[in-house]
């Protein structure tokens, strides 16, 4: 039992420092938050470790030289999607949470945009497992954003066999 507790403490460490807001040094804001909207505090080091795009962005001379808490707006995300994105970044990455599954489409796009291949892979698996007649065309379209052969083929064959099989 103690081993499981130790593992939980280890795996949940990043989520804990986010929840406690310890030593946060950057803010992320969703595109739908407006100028005075809510932002989510985070850690440059964690964002940089999870994403090459954040790493390049946060290592820029402009951000390094700033004495104030920098705010980065992720225009393409709504606030709830941003929360799910941050939740994933601070998680152990073993699976998508229920909250993350609710926003799987936007997280799939974010995984590609911010170069987090593992997030994109988990979202692809979730999208494929959730294929049904009502969303097959949407998923087929999503697979084109960056062309994703596995997602495309799954959606295409589902659609083809559902309607013509």
Swiss-Prot record:
Recorded superkingdom: Eukaryota
InterPro entries in the record: At1g01640-like, BTB/POZ_dom, SKP1/BTB/POZ_sf
SMART domains: BTB
Pfam families for this protein: BTB
SUPFAM superfamilies: POZ domain
Keywords: Ubl conjugation pathway
Protein name in UniProt: Putative BTB/POZ domain-containing protein At2g40440
Species this protein is from: Arabidopsis thaliana (Mouse-ear cress)
Origin organism lineage: Eukaryota, Viridiplantae, Streptophyta, Embryophyta, Tracheophyta
